[in-house]
Structure formats: structure tokens, C-alpha cells
Amino acid sequence: MTTKEQFIEMAKGITRPGIDQMMAWLETTDFYTAPASTRFHGAEEGGLCAHSITVAKRLLEIADLWAPNQYSRDALLTVALFHDLCKISTYTVSPRNVKDDTPGQWTKVPFYKFEPKDSVGCDSHGSLSCYRIMAT
């Protein structure tokens, strides 16, 4: 199963009104192919989607362990899967030269650069994710 398919399967556990519109909107973005960061977790094609899945799995595990039946699975999945929507359409890819194992050899590799286009007045990463959820 691809990362995108895993994400869609997990999102099927969300029953809130608007989830179908949210999933349709994600299809029009780079969410499934974007990185999660430029150098740290998920700094690769598809890293944003993969990171969101990992966060969802961990949150469900933690909730089951520390707060069983205290939060709805619906709420936990919503928070975890969509916590980084602010990163949609914020990365560009350009080549970067990296030293090869062979002395004097360099290899071009993709490098992600963070270039947010519009924060719509949001002052934080979290508030922009919330804005994007409300705007769909």
C-alpha cells in the first residue's frame, strides 16, 4: 500500500462533516508529494504525508495507553492527520551538489527550500493549518 493509500485509509476513520471536501481539496495540492521539512523529519518526496501518518499512529497509541476512551478516535485522527496542512505548497525543489564517496566527485541531489507563499495573516504554523481546514 502506498503512503497516499495509507493516509486515505486512515482518513476514512474520520466521520466529521466536511471530511469529503477536505480529502478532495488535498487531491488538488502537493500534500502527498511534498516533504515535511527541508533537512529533518520527512525531508524527501512524500515526507509530509508519511509524517502525518506516523503522527496519527503514535497519537492513537499514546491515547490508548494514557487516556483510553477519553478522546474520540475521530478527533485524534483529525488532529494528527491534518496538523501540518500549513506546509502545503511551501517547498520548492532545486538541485544541490553533494560530495560522493569517490574523491573529488560530486552528485546532484534534490534539495528542498522552504518558501511560504501566503500566511493569510496567521502568526504560527498551527494557526495556518487550522485556517486551511476551516477554508475548505
Regions found by a protein language model. Give the residues of each.
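Divalent metal-dependent catalytic cores for phosphoryl transfer on phosphate-bearing substrates
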Residues: 50, 62-136
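Active-site flanking loop/helix segments enriched in acidic
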Residues: 28-51, 112-116
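Divalent metal-coordination and catalytic microenvironments
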Residues: 55
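Residue-level recognition of alpha-helical structural elements
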Residues: 3, 18, 44, 71-74
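Generic structural signal for short, flexible, solvent-exposed coil/loop and linker residues
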Residues: 20-21, 29, 37, 65, ...
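Short N-terminal micro-motifs specific to bacterial/archaeal maturation
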Residues: 10-13, 46, 67, 120
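Non-catalytic interface/linker regions that flank or bridge core catalytic/transmembrane domains
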Residues: 1-34
